[in-house]
Each structure stands twice: as C-alpha cells, then as structure tokens.
Amino acid sequence: MANTNLKEAKAAKNDEFYTQFHDIEIEMNAYLEYDPDVFRGKTVLLPCDDPEWSNFTRYFAAKFDELGLKKLISTSYAPDAKKMKLLAEPSLFEKEAPQFDPQKAQTKGKIFVLEKDHTGDGHINIDDLEWEYLEGDGDFKSKEVTQLRNEADIIIHYCPKKLPHRFS
C-alpha cells in the first residue's frame, strides 16, 4: 500500500516528502544555540506548508511561546493544484470548521495564522491556529502568497526539487 502511494506520487511528480518533527527540532536548535532570540518577536512565514501534513507548522505552533514568536503564517496548496491522482480527503480539522466548503476545499489554497490565545488557556499553540481559504490555489509563486513575505521577518520554504526558483 505505501509503495503504491509512492509510485503514484512519483507518477504525479509529487516530490513533497515531509520532514520529520525531530529533524526540524535539531535544525532549529542549531539556530537557537547561536542566538537564543533569533525568533523572538518575529513573524515566520511557511509558504506551501500544510500543517495537516507537514511538521514545520506543527513545530512552530508547539514552540510559539518558547520561541517568543509574534506571528506564524503558513499556506497550503489546493489539492487540485497538486495534480495528484489520489483523492484528497479534507481533515476533520477542516470539515468541522464553520467556513468549510467542499468545493473550495479542492480548488483553493488555505492560509493558517497563529498569533493569539483563542482557547483562553494562557498559551498560544496549535489549538489556537485559525484558517481560511485563499483566493487562489496557494501556489507560492502567486501574488497572494508573495505579498505575505512582506509581512514576514523569516521565511522557511521547502521548494519541491522540480520547481527551483527565486522566491521573489
């Protein structure tokens, strides 16, 4: 079954294989050892990073208070934009949201923002993550997503190997 999924991803030229949480933590710790305040008061942008699948948003959400982040923004591609043969099933997180729209869930990208304690538990974490649909499909080259970089102090971006280019 897993091999079938990999073959389908290869056929669809989907080379977005996700980084493990532990590996992200090791890399970020290197930055923190060099400068413990490297993220303090900063807005971090993670373009084309779906927190329902990727660990980068999960890492920064889990460490939001500890890192002293001001704001976390991540965007994700629309399933239709990925051109995969596999049917993308919206997550429970998405389906239970009042703004859920089955049509938009397939054709529109999403923006996820974390900056406030919405749950009232005194901490800002993944439970406080808010999202909405983008106007477009979430392509990191789109005007909509590139405008977000003007708000960001730090951009962490994994560009699929098939799409290397300048993020400008």
Model-predicted regions and their roles:
Residues 119-147:
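Alpha-helix-centered segments that form part of catalytic cores
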Residues 155-162:
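Amphipathic alpha-helical repeat scaffolds
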Residues 38, 148-150:
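A short, aliphatic-rich alpha-helical micro-motif
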Residues 1-121, 127:
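S-adenosyl-L-methionine
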Residues 138, 152-153:
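Helical hinge/lid and interdomain linker segments adjacent to catalytic or ligand-binding clefts
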Residues 162-168:
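A short, conserved alpha-helix within the catalytic core of class I
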Residues 27-33, 141, 145, 157:
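Structured alpha-helical segments in the cores of large, soluble enzyme domains
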